[in-house]
Curated annotation (Swiss-Prot):
The keyword Phosphoprotein does not apply. It comes from Pseudomonas fluorescens (strain ATCC BAA-477 / NRRL B-23932 / Pf-5). GO terms for biological process: cytoplasmic translation. This is Large ribosomal subunit protein uL6. Gene3D superfamilies: Ribosomal protein L6, alpha-beta domain. GO terms for cellular component: cytosolic large ribosomal subunit. Part of the 50S ribosomal subunit. The gene is rplF. This protein binds to the 23S rRNA, and is important in its secondary structure. It is located near the subunit interface in the base of the L7/L12 stalk, and near the tRNA binding site of the peptidyltransferase center.
Length: 177
């Protein structure tokens, strides 16, 4: 059995889990998420927790059980607490402004960059150089943060660009004559 799949997922108060065939639905205070479970993974709900097991013992099936357990754990955490990712803009004139479902970015280009936020994701700008991306789907929050960072990734000489708040940018020294 996968070492990840051995650990059960604890269901906090206020989180409901429903099975319909291979469709798993997790409902909580912040919303609902759904997942198509692979047919080789067996899920058992007992005493406020979910247990995962592979239907047969081959390597790929055991790996799929561990992956499913990790995805369901992220879903449970998302509908109960939510996820957030913080980005920082470093550079002269770099600004961000959230307007509803659009994030307006000034990143040193000759034009402003307007990023349309997908459904289920919100963005806040506590200051002009900080962006806070929030949502219940961990994969989608990370994907949106990566797409925003890709507009202007941090460069190694001056460190200018869009970076994650916890990211360490390796700096290079300029070439000398």
């Amino acid at each position: 059995m996968s070492r990840v799949a051995k650990n059960p997922v604890k269901l906090p108060a206020g989180v409901e889990v429903k099975f319909a065939g291979q469709q798993l639905s997790v409902k909580g205070a912040k919303g609902t998420l759904e997942l198509n479970v692979h047919s080789s993974v067996e899920i058992v709900q007992e005493a406020g927790e979910l247990r995962f097991a592979a239907r047969n013992g081959d390597q790929q099936t055991r790996a799929m059980a561990g992956t499913t357990r990790a995805l369901v754990n992220n879903m449970v955490q998302g509908v109960s607490q939510g996820f957030e990712r913080k980005l920082q803009l470093v550079g002269v004139g770099y600004k961000a402004q959230a307007k509803g479902t659009v994030l307006n970015l000034a990143l040193g280009f000759s034009h402003p960059v307007d990023y349309e936020l997908p459904e289920g994701i919100t963005a806040e700008t506590p200051s002009q150089t900080d962006i806070l991306i929030k949502g219940i789907d961990k994969q989608l929050v990370g994907q949106v943060a990566a797409e925003i960072r890709d507009f202007r990734p941090p460069e190694p000489y001056k460190g200018k660009g869009v970076r994650y708040a916890d990211e360490v940018v390796r700096r290079k020294e300029a070439k000398k004559k």
